[in-house]
Amino acid sequence: MSTIDHLPPLRSVIRDHDLSARKSMGQNFLLDLNLTAKIARQAGDLSACDVLEIGPGPGGLTRGLLAQGARRVLAIEKDARCLPALAEIAAVYPGRLEVMNGDALEIDPLSALTPPIRVAANLPYNVGTELLVRWLTPQIWPPYWQSLTLMFQREVAERIVARPGSKAYGRLAILAQWRADARIVMQLPPDAFTPPPKVSSSVVQITALPAPRYPADPYVLSKVVAMAFNQRRKMLRAALKGLGPDIEDRLLAAGIEPTERAERVSLEGFCALARAVAAT
């Protein structure tokens, strides 16, 4: 039994409930409760927060969040095989764990959550980026969440915190850093999971700012950035020609040379360009 919550070790839970990870669901289960507890601590003081968790699987991180003192955890799990294991956790923490069986891409969790809200998850790799983009692109800011403590494949994590001029710099970096602080807070080796993935994983902490760093319309900025990085090796005057025949004038108005490439334009530069495009 675990000294954290007197529940069985994760290996036993996975064995007893026959929870072999399914590649089709993007599953890689964390095995070490010390690691899940460490991830939960990265989310900060949870005693006054509801926590949204996506893809809890056998419940390793769920247990860490509850042991860390989370006021309440709402866990969305698509794989019905995991529900009995999660029910065992709920029995140890009465009234503090609610489990929804469904697809996180199709469920609106807000009605089941009470602010303040934080998100913590070992995201299934096949939906992680899409969920992150949704969390980062609401029209209204600040968002419903205070912070996101999320595990990704290391390559994705590096894209979130990347700086201009690096190969990893792109849309994710701009969306994450425009209205939030983003940093990598943990690295995890493949053998921390079952089955072991081919690459290392990283935990990223994203904390919402009260307001954007620079003014810009979210829709326009997202559109401009997507177009620019879809053809990142092209000069911006070519990559953005779909925005209109006067795109060179708009680039110059934003202080950007039309011959520049997307990977060398700063966040401030893209926001200036979004304002110039919106002014047309």
From Swiss-Prot:
Belongs to the class I-like SAM-binding methyltransferase superfamily. rRNA adenine N(6)-methyltransferase family. RsmA subfamily. HAMAP family: 16SrRNA_methyltr_A. This is Ribosomal RNA small subunit methyltransferase A. One of its GO terms (molecular function) is 16S rRNA (adenine(1518)-N(6)/adenine(1519)-N(6))-dimethyltransferase activity. Gene3D superfamilies: Ribosomal RNA adenine dimethylase-like, domain 2, Vaccinia Virus protein VP39. Keywords: Cytoplasm, Methyltransferase, RNA-binding, rRNA processing, S-adenosyl-L-methionine, Transferase. S-adenosyl-L-methionine binds at N28, L30, G55, E77, D103, N122. It comes from the Bacteria. It comes from Roseobacter denitrificans (strain ATCC 33942 / OCh 114). It is found in: Cytoplasm. Its main location: cytoplasm. Its EC number is 2.1.1.182. It catalyses: adenosine(1518)/adenosine(1519) in 16S rRNA + 4 S-adenosyl-L-methionine = N(6)-dimethyladenosine(1518)/N(6)-dimethyladenosine(1519) in 16S rRNA + 4 S-adenosyl-L-homocysteine + 4 H(+). Specifically dimethylates two adjacent adenosines (A1518 and A1519) in the loop of a conserved hairpin near the 3'-end of 16S rRNA in the 30S particle. May play a critical role in biogenesis of 30S subunits. GO terms for cellular component: cytosol. InterPro entries: KsgA/Erm (IPR001737), rRNA_Ade_diMease-like_C (IPR023165), rRNA_Ade_Mease_Trfase_CS (IPR020596), rRNA_Ade_methylase_Trfase_N (IPR020598), rRNA_adenine_dimethylase (IPR011530), SAM-dependent_MTases_sf (IPR029063). Pfam families: RrnaAD (PF00398).
